[in-house]
């Protein structure tokens, strides 16, 4: 049985990995073996952090809403409870955006929430 060398398939696969590793530090961007390990690790980080990003943004929105709510004399939980009782369904992303860019509108929502706390 004749010997089969990798040839074009191997070269293409290695070029693909080196291309993915472009911009990495030192030998991680030039040597196939090291680059392959780093690319695999990077893809794992990317997979994990696509899920982490959703949690991080929710935390950020809650922090911003809490800060704005306290400027209006409410805690975050009391604000959310008051809005729920008032039947106002605004998601946290929109509330955080209002808190940052339109303080008057957020203050109006805060007064509505204050009036609807038991």
UniProtKB/Swiss-Prot annotation:
GO function term, MF aspect, one: structural constituent of ribosome
Signal peptide: none
GO biological process, alphabetically ordered: ribosomal large subunit assembly; translation
Keywords for this protein: Ribonucleoprotein, Ribosomal protein, RNA-binding, rRNA-binding
The keyword Metal-binding is annotated on this UniProt entry: no
Coiled-coil blocks: none
Domain of life: Bacteria
GO cellular component, one term: ribosome
Disulphide bond pairs: none
PROSITE patterns according to UniProt: RIBOSOMAL_L20 (PS00937)
Keyword Aminoacyl-tRNA synthetase: no
Function of the protein: Binds directly to 23S ribosomal RNA and is necessary for the in vitro assembly process of the 50S ribosomal subunit. It is not involved in the protein synthesizing functions of that subunit.
Family: Belongs to the bacterial ribosomal protein bL20 family.
Name of this chain's protein: Large ribosomal subunit protein bL20
Naturally occurring in which organism (per UniProt): Bacillus mycoides (strain KBAB4)
Lineage of the organism: Bacteria, Bacillati, Bacillota, Bacilli, Bacillales
């Amino acid at each position: 049985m004749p010997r089969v060398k990798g040839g074009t398939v191997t070269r293409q696969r290695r070029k693909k990995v080196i291309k993915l590793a472009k911009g990495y530090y030192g030998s991680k961007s030039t040597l196939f073996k090291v680059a392959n390990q780093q690319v695999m690790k990077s893809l794992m980080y990317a997979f994990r952090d696509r899920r982490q990003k959703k949690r991080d943004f929710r935390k950020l929105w809650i922090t911003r809403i809490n800060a704005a709510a306290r400027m209006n004399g409410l805690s975050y939980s009391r604000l959310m409870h008051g809005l729920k009782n008032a039947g106002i369904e605004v998601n946290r992303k929109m509330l955080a955006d209002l808190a940052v860019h339109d303080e008057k509108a957020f203050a109006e929502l805060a007064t509505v929430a204050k009036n609807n706390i038991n």
